[in-house]
Amino acid sequence: VLTDAERKEVTSLWGKASGHAEDYGAEALERLFLSFPTTKTYFSHMDLSKGSAHVRAHGKKVADALTTAVGHFNDMDGALSDLSDLHAHKLRVDPVNFKLLAHCFLVVLARHHPEEFTPSAHAAMDKFLSRVATVLTSKYR
């Protein structure tokens, strides 16, 4: 559970990032695919080249889901329930991939917002993304 101070850190940092949802989401996915090529197997139907419309569109979906999570700190399970079902039952995404993508998002945020990406903001954002990953993998059990 995030503390009030951590929620403020996440809300502040994500407030700056959410206006760039498509760009940041695409960049995080591109980093994921380059750093962890096995993750591409879930996207064999897409053009995964840098800046492709597919990557940008999916990046926006991912970032929009994070925006939803930021808006529902107290009911993340409910807010992300459909997404959790989709990834667990239909897409069958390996749960470790959520952690890998979370790391890529941290890199993107640090790159674009170095002044705001303080040690406390980093820790809060990491905790938040870990919570999102836990929610998304909750239906796997």
From Swiss-Prot:
Positions contributing to heme b binding: 87
Keyword Transcription carried by entry: no
Entry-linked Pfam families: Globin
Cellular component aspect of the GO annotation: blood microparticle; haptoglobin-hemoglobin complex; hemoglobin complex
Record carries keyword Hydrolase: no
Start and end residues of each Globin domain: 1-141
Tissue expression profile of the protein: Red blood cells.
An annotated GO BP: hydrogen peroxide catabolic process
CDD domains hit by this protein: Hb-alpha-like
InterPro entries assigned: Globin, Globin-like_sf, Globin/Proto, Hemoglobin_a-typ, Hemoglobin_oxygen_transport, Hemoglobin_pi
MF annotations from Gene Ontology: haptoglobin binding; heme binding; iron ion binding; organic acid binding; oxygen binding; oxygen carrier activity; peroxidase activity
Binding site for O2: 58
UniProt KW keywords: Heme, Iron, Metal-binding, Oxygen transport, Transport
Additional notes on this entry: This alpha chain is the A variant from the minor hemoglobin II. Its sequence differs from those of the alpha-1 chain variants A and B at nine positions each.
Function: Involved in oxygen transport from the lung to the various peripheral tissues.
UniProt cross-references to PANTHER family, sorted A to Z: HEMOGLOBIN FAMILY MEMBER, HEMOGLOBIN SUBUNIT ALPHA
Quaternary structure annotation from Swiss-Prot or TrEMBL: Heterotetramer of two alpha chains and two beta chains.
Family: Belongs to the globin family.
Name of the protein in question: Hemoglobin subunit alpha-2
